[in-house]
Every structure is written in structure tokens, then in C-alpha cells.
Amino acid sequence: MSSGALLPKPQMHDPLSKRLWVHIVGAFIVDLGVAAAHKFGAAKPRKKAYADFYRNHDPMKDFDEMRKAGVFRSVK
């Protein structure tokens, strides 16, 4: 038996494309994770905060408070 038969041959054909494929798949998985984290960690809470604010918001009350504080000169 020769030592050449025991060692596996190195792959010489297209090693770059296999490496790129692994990195492309990895980048896609990371991208999906970041998108999900942004949606559930930032976008949904912000949307809920805006909805809660406008659900309980009374613009006439704010206007009357600003008018009484003297913010508007033309409104008496």
C-alpha cells in the first residue's frame, strides 16, 4: 500500500464557489434574524406606543392648556 491511497485528494475544482455559497446562506440567515429582531424589538413597540398615545389623546385639551399658558398671541 502506498501512502497516496490513504490520504484523500484535495478538492481542486471550484473551492471558491462552495465557500461563497456557505457565506451567502449564512448572510441570508443573519439577515432574517436581524429583520425579525427589528420588527419585534423596535417597530411593533413603537407602533403600539403611537396607538396608545393617539387612543387617549385629546387635542382640544392640549390646545386649551397652551392657550391658557399664553403660547398663542392671536387666540384669547
UniProtKB/Swiss-Prot annotation:
GO cellular component: mitochondrial inner membrane
Pfam families: COX6C (PF02937)
Topology, Mitochondrial intermembrane side: 56-76
Keyword Transmembrane: yes
Membrane-related topology note: Single-pass membrane protein
Job description of the protein: Component of the cytochrome c oxidase, the last enzyme in the mitochondrial electron transport chain which drives oxidative phosphorylation. The respiratory chain contains 3 multisubunit complexes succinate dehydrogenase (complex II, CII), ubiquinol-cytochrome c oxidoreductase (cytochrome b-c1 complex, complex III, CIII) and cytochrome c oxidase (complex IV, CIV), that cooperate to transfer electrons derived from NADH and succinate to molecular oxygen, creating an electrochemical gradient over the inner membrane that drives transmembrane transport and the ATP synthase.
Record protein name field: Cytochrome c oxidase subunit 6C-1
